[in-house]
Amino acid sequence: MKENSNMNVSTFFARADRTTRASFAVRICCFTLVTVLLTFSSASVRGEQVLLGDPALTSGVPGSGPISVPQIETWLDDEHNFTELTPVLPLGLSQGSSQITGLDENPLTRAKIELGRQLYFDPRLSVDSTVSCASCHDPSMGYTAQTKTGIGIKGQAGGRNSPVSFNRILSDKQFWDGRAGSLEEQAIGPIANPIEMGFTHEGVVKRLASMPVYAKQFEKIFGS
């Protein structure tokens, strides 16, 4: 897993999953690319405001690389990580707060953010374990890629430049042409795209379910 931890990436993941849930029969599959299964969300303790972009939002994550089962168990035992978070925008941008959507149905928590971070940088979501979300949306390159088009498995070139994934919580429309109406709708595509990650939804669900670190997080956060 690529080393990194960033609130904006994690917020992107902690949003997504209504469309995924509707598309997959197996409940855990909703988390193949993103980190929220709304129907099975665990009870959260309400009430903490966090500044969008503040590094404190990801403070205390169990690690920035591969995480052990004992580490994640300790993390999941901390009820603070299940406190419901309300993101607010920095001074001067507060008028944009009305554009933050989806959190009423899908409360944001540090536990979801951390799971999303792990998935974002994990190439095992692709069929040959070579391409992660961060491969085409790299934080060190402004959450995009310095190539003409996105590059997927086996070096295949996509049809368009990779759009910036930074702070996507502020927009419902996704992709350059806006064809996806939400992050939830967008998130189910890349894994099964033969050029991008080349996997199947069923295959990635089975793979994630076989990994104890992921299985424990899904069970504790979503009950499945």
Predicted regions and their residues:
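Periplasmic c-type cytochrome electron-transfer domains
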Residues: 2, 12, 23, 40-224
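Bacterial N-terminal signal peptides that target proteins for export
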Residues: 5-31
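Bacterial N-terminal signal peptides
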Residues: 28-40
